[in-house]
Structures are given as C-alpha cells and as structure tokens.
C-alpha cells in the first residue's frame, strides 16, 4: 500500500470525531437522510469504504439512471441529497427547483473519456464537423448535452446544425445499436459499455468540460437536516480519498450494486476518480461558462443569481 493511501481503518478513525459531534448535536429525534445515487456510484463508494460505519442517523438510498431523474426527485423532496454533474445541476437550478449545491468534487485528472460523443465503428463520421445535419441523441440538460454544445461550438457549428434527439441512456443505447441515430453524447458507465462493444469516440471532454460534480440538496433538507447532511458530506470526502488508492475494491462493490461487469465498473471508477474541492470564486467563475453555454443555445433564461446556487454548509 502506498504511504499516502487512506486505509479503511484510518478512514473510520478519522471520522469518529465527526460522528461523535453529530451525536451531540442535540437532535434527539429519528433522523433519516434520503440519498439519491446515480447508477449506484455514491452508494457503492460509501459502502465499500465503510464511511458510514458509526453514524447515528439512517440513510435511505434511491437509485437513478441519470442526473435529470435524480434532480427531479430532489426538486419534489423525494430525496434530500444526491450527486449530479455541474451542467444538469445548473439546468435544474435555473428551472426553479428548490435545490442548492452543498459540496463540490472534481474529476482528477480532468475528464476525457468519462464524457464522450460516440459514433458506430463503421460510421463515415470522423469528426465533430461531420455531424452537420446528423442526429445526436442525449438527455436534455445532461453533461453529455453540454459536451455536445461545447464540441459543436469549437468546431464552428451552431446548435441547430444538428438534430438533437432527447432519450434516456437506456433508450439511446437501443437507438444507437439500431442506427436510428448518428451519434450519442454520453458518460460512464454507458460510454464505457458502448466503447467495449465497438463504438468510436469522435470527441471527449478534455479541455471542454470542467469536471465538476456537486452534492445537491433540497432547501428543506439544508434547513432541517444540516448537521446530518454535513456529517454525510465529510464522510463522503474521506471516502473519495480512500477510493483514490482502492479502485478495485470500489469497483467490486459497484459491480455488485449495479450488475455492471467488473471490467466496466473498474473503468468507470478509474475514469471518474474525484477529489473534494472548495466552493470558491474560481469554481463559480468556471460555472458561468456552463451557464453561458446553455443560454447561448437558447436552453435556459437565467433568472436566479449563480452565486445563490450554492449553500456552502461545510465552510460555515
């Protein structure tokens, strides 16, 4: 084991004081934190690392196929908190949902094949410029959609140079296999599975997306469950440190939770290696690019200040 790695025992020891503080918070009522997990990712991380051992509150897990579904559940109050990429979060926040980002993480190294635009192996499409007049499938407001908009812009193409088809990841996979679409803007594990099956990458997120993901919480959860929520976030940050040197362990749990093949789960873990980062002015400035991209595409009309999208409960 590398000297700078975080063992499960060290992780739990470091979290002991946090759990004790939560226990002494004065909240004697039954406490339940409803956590949304995309394709099992957050749940597998917390279970494999042992980060939730010793908590004095209950965690209820709900699984979602994509960020949009998770954010809709957050907006309705069906879950208290869940992890989502910066693009879908901004899309949802500007739609008026009562949610805020309460902690930030960043893919490390900066994302490449974690978010991609794919074409069939034998497609004549060789570059983003070749997408003019073609059909791209993705989920509206997703990180895949954001990558497509950025890639089109870099290639000198406006958004209406292509036809976007809005599909769930599962439906898109079927459409991609049947060739009813020309390209697919997607993310892991869907991208990893498609690449394994022969899909070809024509664009990735390198230098086009920031790689930020946020734990997003309902405003009522922030107000009523702040101590529990903050404890969960601190434990998650420690779990990310653990995962950086325990990818195979994390992947095994992820495969068990989701049914993904172990090689796909390991690829997903390695391509989405993340670290906790502060919600600071640099991050907010970076996020203005995301907001401006969606605005330029006519997708959103920002009516909420970006600075108010964040509730930095860990730094208060």
Question: What are the roles of these predicted feature ranges?
Answer:
Residues 72, 76, 90, 129, ...:
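Solvent-exposed, polar/charged alpha-helical surfaces in well-ordered, non-transmembrane soluble domains
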Residues 3-4, 10-25:
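N-terminal export signals
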Residues 294-316:
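Conserved C-terminal helix/tail region of periplasmic/extracytoplasmic solute-binding proteins
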Residues 87, 165-255:
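Pocket-lining segment of extracytoplasmic ligand-binding domains
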Residues 41, 224-299:
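Secondary-structure end/capping motifs
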Residues 127, 159-163, 263:
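Short acidic capping loops at alpha-helix termini that bridge into adjacent secondary structure
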Residues 121-128, 157-158, 220-229:
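Short helix-loop capping/hinge motifs at secondary-structure junctions, enriched
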Residues 29-155, 182, 207:
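Short, glycine-/small- and polar/acidic-enriched structural segments
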